Amino acid sequence: NNNVSVFAGVHKGFAPPTNRTGQDAESSINYELGTRFRVKKLYAEIVGFYNDYSNMLGSDLAASGGSGTLDQFNAGEVRVNGVEVLLNYNVLAETSKFKVPVTLSYTMTNTEFLNDFASTDGTWGTISKGDEIPYISKHQFQSSIGVEHEKLEATVSGRFNGKFRTQAGKGSIPANELVPNSFVVDFAAKYNLNKYIGIIGNINNVFDTTYLVSRVPAGLRPGMPFFASAGLVAQF
């Protein structure tokens, strides 16, 4: 059926260690299974993924709260799995000179260490079996609505990032290890002067929302504040 497709993949991951003794290579097998389909003006994609690490490598970085030695360490077996959903719908009729695409996307991610170990890294620290990997949000959601024409394109988008822990652990997240939910609105536009040259403009964090993104290094870190940029783009 031209409107429905199913796909699957298996990928072997590998990352070599440094020349320090006692380190093993990072190794993983990553699986995905999904479908893409179209129903009239609706396009959808649903993908499930499962990443199986037989050994994950970590690094002692000052940026992640460690001592900054850059030493790597074996984190052991780790499991990461979840689902991604993408929906796209054009509000106007296909015969219209304008397009009004609406896009929704969602990602759910589960993580789990499958063994116990200890490291000097400030973010990972002492790990117990069943702990979640820090700095990975379980829920992420994005939405956008745009207007497209031969001369003009404009898009308003929103980004939701669910709360996440800044230290490995399980269960409820302690207040001093929590980065809370955040929602940020962005805007992008392009005007085509001719078929070769266009004017582009972007606004990140339209409402200048204050939100947190990290607790390392050296305490709480905010996300990008209001930022606007403009430029020319040429295509030949």
Which residues does each PLM region occupy?
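Membrane-embedded beta-barrel scaffold of Gram-negative outer-membrane proteins
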Residues: 6-9, 27-93, 97-117
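Hydrophobic, lipid-facing positions within transmembrane beta-strands of outer-membrane proteins
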Residues: 29-33, 44, 71, 81-85, ...
